[in-house]
């Protein structure tokens, strides 16, 4: 191990992953941002879904200061973060066949919308079926996953496929299988997961690309401001009223 303290080691590992995203995923980030900008310009709606801790990155996009107001959370009860007790139930729900179809049937998603599906492993039934079913509806799907899982783990979907196999675009988070960056001789398991910070940064890079792409086309991006700065509340009220038919968290 490095002579640096564990905190420094973890931060160095996270920085290394972020640099890899910047250098290796630049084209995919640009394509994803353009896809979202196209969706906004064409009157579509934006949605984000993640199960378990992957939901944290999805939630970070919704009703976010500096973020796109049109991004809505596609919530599945029991799998949004750790909102269910006992917590392992959420992991079990990710493996239930047919749950994704039931969710989409009761959601406002329609052809012409865009859906970000965030799943670190991309191997469970829920994200795989979510991507398959959404594309069948005519929804553009961007998958955010660690591609390494497809070569180092077995799919838990009956098709034997992974999230990455059913997307219009894939963003590879580069996270190692197991999601732990550090080891120690006195600790029997690897520790210090980096997927949340890295995936959130990856998605904010996509949002920044989408906003600037819209601006370059002469379209004001529908951005929210912080409610804790003067004028922020009034600004957000105006934006949400203007796009009220494409925002579902305000009702």
Where are these regions (language model features)?
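Generic N-terminal amphipathic, Lys/Arg-enriched alpha-helix
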Residues: 1-23
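Short, surface-exposed alpha-helical recognition segments that flank or form part
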Residues: 5, 20-27, 91-94, 194
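Active-site phosphate/pyrophosphate-binding segments
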Residues: 24, 28-32, 66-69, 212-251
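A short, well-structured juxtamembrane/interface segment
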Residues: 24-41, 103
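Short active-site oxyanion
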Residues: 44-46
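Glycine-rich phosphate-binding loops that contact phosphosugars or nucleotide phosphates
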Residues: 48-207
């Amino acid at each position: 191990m490095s002579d640096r303290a564990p905190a420094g080691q973890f931060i160095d590992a996270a920085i290394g992953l972020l640099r890899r995203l910047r250098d290796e995923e630049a084209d995919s980030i640009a394509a994803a941002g353009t896809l979202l900008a196209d969706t906004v310009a064409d009157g579509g709606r934006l949605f984000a879904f993640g199960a378990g801790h992957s939901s944290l990155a999805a939630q970070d996009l919704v009703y976010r200061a500096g973020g796109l107001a049109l991004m809505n959370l596609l919530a599945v009860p029991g799998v949004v973060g750790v909102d269910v007790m006992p917590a392992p139930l959420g992991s079990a729900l990710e493996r239930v066949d047919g749950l994704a179809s039931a969710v989409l049937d009761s959601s406002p998603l329609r052809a012409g919308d865009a859906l970000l599906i965030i799943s670190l492993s991309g191997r469970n039934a829920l994200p795989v079926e979510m991507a398959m079913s959404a594309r069948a509806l005519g929804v553009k799907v961007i998958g955010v996953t660690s591609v390494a899982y497809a070569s180092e783990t077995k799919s838990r979907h009956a098709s034997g496929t992974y999230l990455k196999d059913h997307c219009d675009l894939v963003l590879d988070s580069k996270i190692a299988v197991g999601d732990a960056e550090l080891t120690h001789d006195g600790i029997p398991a690897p520790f210090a997961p980096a997927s949340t910070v890295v995936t959130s940064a990856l998605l904010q890079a996509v949002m920044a690309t989408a906003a600037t792409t819209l601006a370059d086309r002469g379209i004001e991006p529908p951005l929210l401001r912080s409610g804790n700065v003067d004028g922020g509340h009034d600004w957000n009220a105006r934006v949400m009223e203007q796009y009220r038919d494409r925002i579902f968290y305000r009702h």
